[in-house]
């Protein structure tokens, strides 16, 4: 088990050396964002359309920063259900890749060299092997710009989700939606900044399929 953990640690470290150029997304949350009321008709119509997207995939780049880890990589995300999704992290420079696959009995993490590890507790496995402590259950909704309607969220003047804060597991996550693919129907996020007190995720989505 220790050998496998060491291998994955080295694998993630490899992303630091071989990853794409750093994302040009600021670490700082934007200030003075103009917002509109949540009852806005265009926002409510947009939210309804977002909710109807149940199965989707996206590709882009992700940057992760914490006191223990710092890396940037390409990603492919495929989502079908809370117990059926896959996140692949990979480098375009080398053959390095890592796949997190959720299934009915938990999560399996594997790499391009055939190493794999499965556990029922997906979040604990990701934390142990990769060092990331991210809210996997919520990520599928946050990525497409769908807030928890009971949470504190703001709608921008563009009639899309601008930001939200969400308390979870003793910490508070914030999300800022900096740019959208407005050529899509419905418009879907392009640049996202996710933060809590100890972690920062920068996400740039290049392509959406649904």
Curated annotation (Swiss-Prot):
Please provide, in alphabetical order, the Gene Ontology terms of the cellular component aspect for this entry.
cell outer membrane
Mark the transmembrane ranges.
none
Gene Ontology biological process: lipoprotein localization to outer membrane; protein transport
Chain residues carrying a lipid of type N-palmitoyl cysteine: 20
Checking InterPro entries in the record gives:
LolA/LolB/LppX (IPR029046), OM_lipoprot_LolB (IPR004565)
Signal peptide range in chain numbering: 1-19
| Alphabetical keyword list | Cell outer membrane, Chaperone, Lipoprotein, Membrane, Palmitate, Protein transport, Signal, Transport
Task: Please give the Pfam families that the UniProt record associates with this protein.
Answer: LolB (PF03550)
Covalent lipid sites (S-diacylglycerol cysteine): 20
Main localization (coarse):
membrane
Question: How does it sit in the bilayer?
Answer: Lipid-anchor
> Which cellular compartments is it found in?
Cell outer membrane
Share what the entry says about its subunit structure, partners included. Answer: Monomer.
Q: Which family does it belong to?
A: Belongs to the LolB family.
* Functional description taken from the UniProt entry: Plays a critical role in the incorporation of lipoproteins in the outer membrane after they are released by the LolA protein.
Which NCBIfam families does the entry mention? lolB
Q: Specify the protein name.
A: Outer-membrane lipoprotein LolB
- Gene name for this UniProt entry: lolB
